[in-house]
């Protein structure tokens, strides 16, 4: 499954156990822990990530599911204008894969905390 359209990186409320995890609960697929590079912050009380290939690594989850393309318009609406969907690399079990992620456009902090 090397198609980024069938992979989604989640790091906040959509992650397993998160308050909005129910939006992905109906999909069949495989969850794996992963690492992503960038800056982590918050916006309106929710985690917000900005991709930076030179930034520190942060823990996240990767969902691989053939059903993702079908629900992405719904997720785009849910995330709204505060987030944009990008394709970035994620490190999963020692190898890099390309996957989609919702990156925050805004932050409540002046500078994203590199260690968050």
Mark where each language-model region is.
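Glycine-aromatic micro-motifs
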Residues: 1-116
């Amino acid at each position: 499954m090397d198609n980024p359209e069938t992979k989604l990186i989640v790091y906040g409320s959509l992650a397993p156990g998160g308050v909005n995890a129910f939006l992905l609960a109906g999909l069949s697929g495989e969850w794996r822990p992963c690492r992503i590079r960038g800056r982590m912050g918050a916006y309106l009380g929710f985690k917000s990530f900005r991709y930076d290939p030179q930034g520190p690594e942060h823990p996240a989850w990767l969902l691989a599911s053939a059903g993702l393309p079908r629900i992405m318009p719904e997720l785009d609406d849910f995330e709204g204008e505060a987030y944009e969907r990008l394709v970035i690399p994620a490190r999963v079990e020692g190898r890099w894969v390309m996957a989609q992620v919702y990156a925050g456009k805004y932050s409540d902090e002046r500078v994203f905390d590199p260690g968050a």
